[in-house]
């Protein structure tokens, strides 16, 4: 019983760390997507500015 209680605590801690890591990865992906979106807008503006010159 003691072993299962300890392993339960370890699993709980492991799951918590995995959740934190997943949230950090999600945040990083979201930031990268935002950066790519801004770059895409800038490139579109640069390419379309040639049409008006």
UniProtKB/Swiss-Prot annotation:
Protease recorded as keyword: no
Compartment(s) of residence: Cell membrane
List of glycosylated residues: 5
TM region(s), chain numbering: 30-47
Pfam families reported for this sequence: DVL
Positions of region (Required for DVL/RTFL small polypeptide activity): 20-51
Keyword Ion transport: no
GO BP terms in the entry: negative regulation of cell population proliferation; shoot system development
Membrane-topology descriptor: Single-pass membrane protein
Chief localisation class: membrane
A GO cellular component entry from the record: plasma membrane
Keyword annotations of the record: Cell membrane, Developmental protein, Glycoprotein, Membrane, Transmembrane, Transmembrane helix
Coiled-coil regions, chain positions: none
Stored InterPro entries: DVL (IPR012552)
Family listed: Belongs to the DVL/RTFL small polypeptides family.
Function: Small polypeptide acting as a regulatory molecule which coordinates cellular responses required for differentiation, growth and development, probably by restricting polar cell proliferation in lateral organs and coordinating socket cell recruitment and differentiation at trichome sites.
Name this protein carries in UniProt: Small polypeptide DEVIL 21
Species assigned in the record: Arabidopsis thaliana
């Amino acid at each position: 019983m003691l072993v299962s209680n300890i392993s339960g605590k370890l699993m709980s801690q492991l799951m918590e760390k995995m959740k934190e890591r997943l949230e950090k990865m999600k945040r990083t992906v979201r930031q990268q997507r935002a950066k790519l979106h801004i770059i895409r807008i800038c490139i579109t503006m640069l390419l379309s500015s040639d049409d008006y010159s």
